[in-house]
UniProtKB/Swiss-Prot annotation:
GO MF entry, a single one: protein-disulfide reductase activity
CDD domains registered for this protein in UniProt: TRX_family
Species assigned in the record: Chlorobaculum thiosulfatiphilum (Chlorobium limicola f.sp. thiosulfatophilum)
NCBIfam families: thioredoxin
Protein name: Thioredoxin
Family the UniProt entry places it in: Belongs to the thioredoxin family.
One Pfam family cited in the UniProt record for this chain: Thioredoxin
Disulphide bridges, residue numbers: C32-C35
Amino acid sequence: AGKYFEATDKNFQTEILDSDKAVLVDFWASWCGPCMMLGPVIEQLADDYEGKAIIAKLNVDENPNIAGQYGIRSIPTMLIIKGGKVVDQMVGALPKNMIAKKIDEHIG
């Protein structure tokens, strides 16, 4: 089964920005209700896109530098990063098919 990647301030550059695959990063926190609702969706996406894209989660409380760098104000916010640049942004606990459609636009 695919597993989402646990992004941190420390590994963000090497694992996310330097990745040759498209990366979905879910900015979340444990106290955020909608983030918790999105959790299982992120896990399903990690399964669906195994080998095709990287699905990552970043805890904003534990990794304030990256969250600040990207100006994350409300969570959950999902960024799609490709070639080190943000190519798409989504805010809120969106349905899986909407998120998948966005990822599909940036892979291949």
